[in-house]
């Protein structure tokens, strides 16, 4: 339970440039990703409060099919103190559609993927699930994330998708359920509502996994 999400840790442990003059070593690298996540690079990043904010920035003009769920997820994230940003593709290493930071409680959507409303919503659900995992680790003031579901609950199709994407990476257990959430309408939204409706203590109404329970007890949250 003391492992950080590897993608986040990689981005945050690298040397980052100063606020005054961010000298990014290269775009579409972990260096540029970390600079953005630490908010030392803010050019071409835009805070998103509703779908309308994305429509102002992106070419695709019809987000009607995803508007309701997207707006609801962003509203629940706001209640948790999590900010959502749309950001230029230049910050993201190849294949990164989005990233969540357990340090700043912010996440960033790659504008080159967000231009497709279905892909955008899947990424939003996925990264917002990581925000929920952060809260399950005894509150999002920490830099840890917890597994919410027992691994055997994750449908096999999403297990395989995560294994293809992440291989034998230590983050695989977290990513399996995030993949599941990303592909399942309202799964992330319902979890965020459970968190907010219970004052940030979802474990009071939903039994945690054995390992997460052990962590919560160690931290004095149960």
Feature map (PLM): residue ranges:
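Sec/Tat signal peptide C-region and signal peptidase I cleavage site
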Residues: 16-20
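Bacterial N-terminal signal peptides
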Residues: 7-15
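Stable alpha-helical elements in mature extracytoplasmic
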Residues: 69-73, 120, 124, 128, ...
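Catalytic Zn2+-binding segment of zinc metalloproteases
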Residues: 128-145
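Short pre-active-site segment immediately N-terminal to the catalytic Zn-binding motif
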Residues: 107-124
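Metalloprotease/metallohydrolase-associated module, dominated by Zn2+-dependent proteases
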Residues: 142-222
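Positively charged n-region of N-terminal signal peptides that target proteins for export
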Residues: 1-4
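Auxiliary, metal-adjacent structural segments of Zn-dependent hydrolase domains
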Residues: 21-22, 31, 36-103
């Amino acid at each position: 339970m003391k492992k950080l999400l590897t993608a986040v840790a990689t981005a945050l442990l690298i040397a980052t440039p100063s606020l005054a003059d961010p000298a990014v070593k290269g775009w579409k690298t972990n260096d540029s990703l970390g600079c953005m996540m630490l908010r030392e690079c803010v050019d071409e990043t835009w805070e998103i409060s509703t779908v309308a904010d994305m429509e102002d920035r992106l070419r695709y003009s019809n987000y009607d099919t995803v508007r309701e769920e997207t707006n609801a997820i962003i509203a629940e994230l706001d209640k948790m103190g999590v900010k959502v940003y749309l950001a230029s593709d230049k910050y993201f290493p190849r294949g990164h559609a989005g990233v969540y930071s357990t340090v700043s409680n912010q996440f960033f959507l790659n504008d080159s993927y967000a231009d497709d409303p279905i892909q955008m919503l899947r990424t939003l659900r996925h990264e917002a699930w990581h925000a929920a995992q952060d809260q399950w680790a005894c509150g999002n003031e920490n830099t840890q994330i917890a597994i919410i579901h027992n691994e055997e609950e994750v449908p096999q199709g999403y297990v395989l998708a995560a294994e293809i994407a992440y291989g034998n990476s230590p983050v695989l257990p977290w990513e399996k359920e995030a993949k599941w959430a990303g592909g399942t309408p309202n799964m992330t939204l319902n979890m965020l509502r459970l968190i907010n409706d219970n004052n940030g203590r979802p474990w009071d109404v939903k039994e945690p996994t054995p390992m997460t329970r052990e962590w919560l007890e160690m931290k004095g949250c149960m």
